[in-house]
């Protein structure tokens, strides 16, 4: 397992504070939301995986924002489809 240094990730993001926010968001995606890592897991924890992804330039605040917008769009589309199916079912009953 290669050691990840925070300095390598900071260089990609710009400053420590933004890097911490990006790493936390990405680690949460991996750990809680079930998103697939973009690098080999190598038995690392989600925070280390997130730092390695940032270090390689695979994850930025912009990519996380775009991913979250896509997730919201997909969720909204599913909700609209569900409401349409319910409405159609009611129309068939009447």
Swiss-Prot record:
This protein's record includes keyword Transcription: yes
Any GO BP: DNA-templated transcription
EC annotation from Swiss-Prot or TrEMBL: 2.7.7.6
Gene Ontology MF terms in the entry: DNA binding; DNA-directed RNA polymerase activity
Cellular component terms (Gene Ontology): DNA-directed RNA polymerase complex
Protein task: Promotes RNA polymerase assembly. Latches the N- and C-terminal regions of the beta' subunit thereby facilitating its interaction with the beta and alpha subunits.
UniProt subunit comment: The RNAP catalytic core consists of 2 alpha, 1 beta, 1 beta' and 1 omega subunit. When a sigma factor is associated with the core the holoenzyme is formed, which can initiate transcription.
Similarity remark: Belongs to the RNA polymerase subunit omega family.
Protein name from the UniProt record: DNA-directed RNA polymerase subunit omega
Gene: rpoZ
